[in-house]
Amino acid sequence: MSTAEMRAKLERAREAQARRFTAGDRMDCNARIPERRFRELCAMEAPAEALFLAALRSLKVSARARGHIVRLARTIADLEGSDRIAERHVAEAVGYRGRDSR
């Protein structure tokens, strides 16, 4: 992927985030999504949610790390142009988090 292609992909992801947040939100990117809004703003497909819950059990991550995984999966989905978080997005996010998330 060229630099120009990557830049365009990132710009589309940022545009998706801008559309997601309303004027009254105190958020401008996925990193600022509060946990109470996860269900609304970070909708997961059923297989993605199953993988997420299985990963939480097996990795025994902290509550804070759980939030990081959800936000990261949302960002990965945005980079792909996906409205919902898919299983592959969760798998990638969990892979980035690794075992250092305890």
PLM regions and their residue ranges:
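Basic, amphipathic alpha-helical bundle interface domains used for macromolecular binding and assembly
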Residues: 1-102
